[in-house]
Amino acid sequence: LAMALILGAPAAEALNGLASFHGTGRRFELKATVHGIRVIDDYGHHPTEIDVTLTAAKRYAGDGRVLVIFQPHRYSRTQAFMNEFARALSIADEVVLLEIYAASEAPITGITSKTIAVQMEHGRFIPNFLEASDWVIDNAKPGDVIITLGAGDVNSLAPIISDGLARRFN
């Protein structure tokens, strides 16, 4: 608001614009709330972004837990930040790691999401999307926050998880 006013925008126009702004897509985007379980999607795919997102999620969850389905983006990034990913993801209470989203990169021998999961106390490697979704659906409790996290196609799981939670609790 202050910047809009400094740049000469009329105050009423700036306030109307601010009132209609609903945030940026795929950045801590609330996709659904089912039986007190919030399902969020976030584009975070670098350890620093993940740290910030999960720290905020822990506060947002209050007494609830944070359950994450993470899909690393690119083999080269996973190789470069493997330890940092494990540390940042460990902020969450439970983490399911999907296979790496290649984004046109060739696989790197020995680099998989499992190599991150084994560094974590509460990490598990479940490469299949539906099995990963089922694990989260089966383990979520009212008050928990579920986050689909990553720059690949992990966001496609948010509606699957929401529907699964609705079936489980209704």
Per-range role (PLM):
Residues 1-94, 118:
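Nucleotide phosphate-binding/pyrophosphate-handling subdomain across enzymes
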Residues 39-42, 123, 146:
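Generic structural signal for residues in well-ordered beta-strands
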Residues 45, 72-75, 100-103, 151-154:
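Short glycine-rich anion-binding loops that position phosphate/pyrophosphate groups of nucleotides
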Residues 52, 80-82, 108-109, 137, ...:
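Short amphipathic alpha-helical segments
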Residues 55-59, 83-87, 111-113, 142, ...:
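Short, solvent-exposed amphipathic alpha-helical segments in soluble enzyme
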Residues 86-142:
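C-terminal helical cap/extension that packs against the catalytic core
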Residues 97-100, 164-170:
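Short, flexible loop segments at boundaries between secondary-structure elements
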Residues 132-164:
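A glycine-rich beta-strand to alpha-helix segment
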